[in-house]
């Protein structure tokens, strides 16, 4: 039973007695399949970005943020440590999807994240782009998204957490 989350962790995230495997990054792979109630998979996310308008729920497991940015239970469940962010980017499925959907975002005929996402999701997207831009060393598709939609300005809270000055 060690490969499953303990019951107290399941209770914290509202999934008591559901056998969610605690393999590295499993929560993102499961999320991106679209099997979670009221959430949609990666294919839906990509189609929505290509159409220029996010309409359903999927941002947490497609564009994760650094742990410590929020107290929202779902967002924090999908938040990543620096180690997990590096593993996410290097993962053959998750990393390639993150690059693919970020590239698709560059092709959207808009220059305002709020016109593509809601205001709150625009903040989440900027935080995720900041995280993955920094761990990829900059000069990446993530920097291009920041340049196009955020005037090149990274999320200061993400940077402070990554720099160790905000916990």
Show where each model-derived region lies.
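Conserved, aromatic- and glycine-enriched, well-ordered alpha/beta core segments
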Residues: 4-123
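A charged, amphipathic interaction segment
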Residues: 99-167
């Amino acid at each position: 039973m060690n490969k499953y989350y303990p019951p107290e962790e399941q209770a914290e995230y509202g999934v008591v007695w559901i056998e969610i495997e605690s393999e590295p990054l499993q929560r993102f792979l499961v999320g991106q399949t679209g099997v979670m109630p009221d959430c949609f998979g990666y294919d839906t996310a990509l189609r929505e970005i290509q159409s220029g308008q996010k309409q359903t729920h999927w941002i947490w497991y497609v564009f994760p943020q650094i742990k410590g940015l929020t107290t929202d239970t779902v967002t924090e469940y999908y938040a990543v440590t620096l180690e997990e962010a590096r593993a996410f980017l290097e993962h053959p499925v998750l990393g390639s999807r993150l690059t693919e959907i970020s590239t698709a975002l560059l092709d959207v005929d808009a220059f305002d994240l709020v016109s593509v996402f809601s205001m709150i999701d625009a903040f989440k997207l900027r935080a995720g782009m900041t995280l993955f831009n920094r761990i990829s060393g900059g000069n990446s598709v993530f920097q291009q998204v920041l340049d196009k939609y955020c005037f090149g300005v990274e999320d200061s809270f993400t940077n402070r957490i990554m720099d160790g000055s905000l916990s």
